[in-house]
Regions:
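Short non-domain terminal segments
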Residues: 5-7, 13, 61, 84, ...
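Generic alpha-helical secondary structure signal
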Residues: 11-13, 56, 173, 181
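Bacterial Sec-dependent N-terminal signal peptides
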Residues: 1-23
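Feature activates predominantly on carbohydrate-active enzymes
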Residues: 42, 46, 79-85, 90-215
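Acidic, contiguous N-terminal accessory segments
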Residues: 19-92, 122-126
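Prokaryotic Sec-type signal peptides and long signal-anchor helices
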Residues: 11-13, 67, 212
Length: 215
C-alpha cells in the first residue's frame, strides 16, 4: 500500500510538472521531405531540453489554436531566397519557417535552435528574417592518413581497415560529427586519403618522385 501511494504521488507530481510547461507545436506538411522532418526533430530535441512540452503534427498545417505557440515548417518555391536559404516570419503565436529547399528548412530550424540556446531557453524568435549561405560548398576535411610509415612500407599508404583507422568505423561518432556539420551550416565532407600506390604519375622534372618501378 505504501509503495502504491508513493507511485501515485510521483505520477501526480510529474503530471503537474508537465501541466506547468509551456506547449509548443511543430507542424509539417503531409508530404514533408526527410530534411524537413530532420529539422523538426532537431528543433523538438532542443525545445524538450529547454523545458517545453512539444507537440509534433504532420499532416494538417492549419493554424487552429492561436493560444499555442506554433512553428510551421514548409518548403516554398520562393525565387527571392538563395539556394538553401530560408525565411522566418511571425504572426502572433505562429512562427513560419519557409525554406527554398529542404536544407533551407534545416538552416531555418538551426536559427531558431541557436536563439533558444543563446537566450537561456526563451523563445526569442525574429519577427522577420531572410538568410542564406554565401558559398555553395561549405565543409570540413578529414584526413585518412597517419604521421608514420606502416611497418614494411616506404611511403605513406595505408589499408583502410578497422585496425588501422578504428574511428572511421565508429557510426555513433560519425552521426555526432555530421550533426556538428549541420549545426555549422556545412553541406559537404571531404576525405583526404593517401593514395593506395606510391605514385602513378611520371614527371620529367621530378624523376625521383616515381617510387614504383615502371616494370
Amino acid at each position: 500500500m505504501k509503495n502504491t501511494r508513493l507511485f501515485m504521488f510521483a505520477a501526480c507530481t510529474l503530471f503537474l510538472a508537465a501541466c506547468g510547461r509551456q506547449t509548443v507545436k511543430i507542424m509539417t506538411p503531409p508530404d514533408a521531405s526527410n530534411r524537413v522532418l530532420f529539422g523538426a526533430e532537431q528543433l523538438q530535441t532542443t525545445l524538450d531540453k529547454a523545458g517545453y512540452q512539444v507537440m509534433m503534427q504532420q499532416g494538417d498545417t492549419t493554424f487552429s489554436d492561436p493560444e499555442i505557440k506554433t512553428i510551421l515548417l514548409t518548403e516554398v518555391n520562393d525565387t527571392t531566397l538563395k539556394k538553401e536559404g530560408f525565411h522566418i516570419s511571425m504572426t502572433g503565436n505562429l512562427t513560419r519557417v519557409s525554406g527554398r529547399d529542404g536544407s533551407g528548412v534545416i538552416y531555418g530550424c538551426r536559427e531558431l535552435i541557436d536563439r533558444v540556446n543563446d537566450s537561456d531557453g526563451k523563445l526569442n524568435f525574429p519577427e522577420e528574417l531572410k538568410d542564406g549561405p554565401e558559398m555553395v560548398l561549405r565543409g570540413a576535411c578529414v584526413g585518412l592518413q597517419k604521421m608514420t610509415y606502416l611497418p614494411g612500407h616506404g611511403v605513406y599508404e595505408y589499408p583502410y581497415t578497422p585496425e588501422s583507422f578504428p574511428w572511421f568505423y565508429d557510426k555513433e561518432q560519425w552521426i555526432k560529427y555530421l550533426d556538428m556539420l549541420v549545426a555549422n551550416r556545412m553541406n559537404s565532407l571531404y576525405l583526404w586519403n593517401g593514395h593506395p600506390f606510391a605514385s602513378l604519375v611520371k614527371l620529367e622534372d621530378y624523376p625521383f618522385a616515381l617510387e614504383v618501378d615502371e616494370e
